[in-house]
């Protein structure tokens, strides 16, 4: 269950970035391709994929993620009374679930992680629109025969 919300304390922010230039149009239709990170205590936590069976979580300076993403907005998710060490413990625990080789564009992406971390810290979920495109694509993926779809993640080596 999420930590108790407080009106005072350390703010938790959800930082949202555009992944594509077409987001400026898609956003107004309730869609878009976004990267998200969670900022707390001057650190931004996010999730990305790699080919190893270890945590895919990484920490950056706030508003300075890797890659060519463009900052869109920050949403204050609430304030917490947790210590930096307690936050680190929560992030480390999530790192056991969010392994780099488990990244999947539709079902286990940076937005899923950000939602989970926001909930663990504040008891509030991230806005649904940040991952709406992945959710819609997941439904389409389930409706189409597998041979019609290319794999979204590379197959594991034998």
Spell out what each predicted region is.
Residues 35, 92, 115-116, 134:
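Short glycine-/small-residue-rich flexible loop motifs, especially phosphate/cofactor-binding loops
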Residues 111, 128-131, 145:
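Alpha-helical catalytic/interaction cores of small GTPase-regulatory modules
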Residues 1-108, 140-158:
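Non-catalytic ligand/cofactor/substrate-binding and regulatory segments of enzyme domains
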